[in-house]
């Protein structure tokens, strides 16, 4: 296989499907299914959606935190949860009873605590993904990767939650296995678990891929999932959580106001916003990326294989459409200037039409 393609889309080392399989018991079926470099290139070429797997921090350290975290994904009992054995928890009484069993089996303290007893995971796909197929893929992924641990699933979809149109699955999983061992997921295992989710989606007819942001040429990050869901509100008492959320909001507003002022100032003065050291570094990385892409495409084309030629053509098309490397402030300034130019063109067009109308009226007289 192309060495450039491997560098562009590195493969993940195989990892055990579960975290409690002894070496002597491992077979090919005991490992997570990962993507090859060509699988990832094909996904980019076909512009398949990226499978999203978020591993939350292990901040659930006592029974109070656990109940509140599960209540959140259950929308206070309005969304039915599912257990690892596929049985349902249809309301607060059901999941409170289940969580009390966790408390007794793991000796979870009522309050306080210094060790993690559970963590949050989120699986997600773009709007329009078939809900039933998505749910089945999530169930399979959870059973494949989290067997040996207690967990509950909560599905937030357009049909169950008015607040979302993007299907996602919340998972609260115990961090203490049935054998008493504590969960540990390193970065390689996280990548392998994400790619296994792609395989599970494919099992139910949903095409997706899992690649690095750098390989895709993505620059601006979206709003962190921790900001969207404010996960830390579960890590302390209600009053402390409220104060924390307010402080974080004020901090974001101050930063946003500073960005807005810098954009307005640059727009009025007709100057550009200088690159930050981070943007300068990203531009250099973009150059390296495009050089590597060029080599990978050339190697695919040289193979003469019809499938490789399709992938090469798709990669060319994808990387041609990458947006410029710029900060959020720089992008806002560029869009403002584009809007100004478009408005000017529209105003010029209106003036020309009015002038033509006047000339026409003059001739008719």
What spans do the regions from the language model cover?
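N-terminal nicking endonuclease/strand-transfer module with a His-rich metal-binding environment
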Residues: 1-365
């Amino acid at each position: 296989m192309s060495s450039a393609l491997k560098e562009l889309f590195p493969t993940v080392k195989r990892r055990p499907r579960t975290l409690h399989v002894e070496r002597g018991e491992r077979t090919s079926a005991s490992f997570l299914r990962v993507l090859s470099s060509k699988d990832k290139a094909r996904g980019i070429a076909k512009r398949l959606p990226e499978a999203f797997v978020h591993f939350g921090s292990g901040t659930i350290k006592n029974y109070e935190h656990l109940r509140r975290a599960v209540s959140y994904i259950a929308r206070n009992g309005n969304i039915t949860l599912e257990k690892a054995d596929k049985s349902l928890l249809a309301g607060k009484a059901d999941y409170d009873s289940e969580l009390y069993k966790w408390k007794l089996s793991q000796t979870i303290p009522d309050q306080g605590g210094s060790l993690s007893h559970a963590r949050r995971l989120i699986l997600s796909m773009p709007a329009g993904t078939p809900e039933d197929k998505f749910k089945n893929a999530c169930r399979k992924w959870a059973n494949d990767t989290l067997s040996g641990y207690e967990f509950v699933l909560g599905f937030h979809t357009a049909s169950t939650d008015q607040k979302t149109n993007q299907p996602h699955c919340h998972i609260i999983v115990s961090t203490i296995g049935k054998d008493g061992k504590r969960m540990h997921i390193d970065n390689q295992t996280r990548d392998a678990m994400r790619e296994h989710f792609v395989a599970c989606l494919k099992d139910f007819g949903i095409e997706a891929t899992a690649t690095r942001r750098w390989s895709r040429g993505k620059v601006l990050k979206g709003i962190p999932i921790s900001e969207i869901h404010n996960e830390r509100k579960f890590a302390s008492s209600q009053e402390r959580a409220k104060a924390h959320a307010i402080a974080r909001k004020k901090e974001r507003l101050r930063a946003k106001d500073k960005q807005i002022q810098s954009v307005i100032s640059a727009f009025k003065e007709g100057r550009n916003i200088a690159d930050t050291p981070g943007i300068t570094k990203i531009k250099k990385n973009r150059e390296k990326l495009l050089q590597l892409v060029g080599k990978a495409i050339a190697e695919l084309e040289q193979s003469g294989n019809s499938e490789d030629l399709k992938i090469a053509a798709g990669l060319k098309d994808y990387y041609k459409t990458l947006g410029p490397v710029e900060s959020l402030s720089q992008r806002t300034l560029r869009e403002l200037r584009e809007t100004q130019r478009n408005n000017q063109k529209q105003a010029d067009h209106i003036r020309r039409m009015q002038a033509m109308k006047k000339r026409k009226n003059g001739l008719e007289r």
